[in-house]
Amino acid sequence: MKRAKKYPFLTLQRQRFHLNFENASSAAGIPAERDFYRWAWSALKNEYLRADIGLILLDEEEARAYNRDYRGKDYATNVLSFALNEGEILPCQVSERLYGDLIICPQVVLKEAAEQGKTPERHFAHLTIHGTLHLMGYDHIKDDEAEIMEAEEIRLMRAAGYPNPYREDGH
């Protein structure tokens, strides 16, 4: 019997990045776990040697509670990012490893995709990349920071085979 080839780069990638994925949402039409892994890894791979990210899909009520409790905004949002590395939480010797959590609300994502004329897959890809960039320290509060973050999102989306997420015509 023939043995399957082992590809060392895939083994190395799995050692470098772990995605703890949980779908606690009742929404239909959600991409596969491997897609979320691929999108998050595309953002991480050039800047972080190692990362452990929890990604949970929550229904609107729970997503709203997190947004209210942590951001003071009483509505469900599309994605929330919680970076463990912010501040002085971890000792310096492990700071090259990124730890964080993403919460995505599929109902909000699906509604936004329909309103914006995007495919659900494309919008999930964008928001996974967007949330991962937040974990990495990117932000969009100030205009100059927003330009940098949006440029990186556009680059990563195009590299993944998707159009510019900020253009209505999708090009």
UniProtKB/Swiss-Prot annotation:
UniProt entry tagged with the keyword Disulfide bond: no
UniProt-recorded name of the protein: Endoribonuclease YbeY
Subcellular location: Cytoplasm
Cofactor comment: Binds 1 zinc ion.
Keyword Protein biosynthesis: no
GO biological processes: rRNA processing
Keywords: Cytoplasm, Endonuclease, Hydrolase, Metal-binding, Nuclease, Ribosome biogenesis, rRNA processing, Zinc
GO MF entries: metalloendopeptidase activity; RNA endonuclease activity; zinc ion binding
Known function: Single strand-specific metallo-endoribonuclease involved in late-stage 70S ribosome quality control and in maturation of the 3' terminus of the 16S rRNA.
Family: Belongs to the endoribonuclease YbeY family.
GO CC aspect terms: cytoplasm
EC code: 3.1.-.-
Binding site for Zn(2+): 130, 134, 140
Top class in the EC scheme: hydrolase
Cofactor(s) it depends on: Zn(2+)
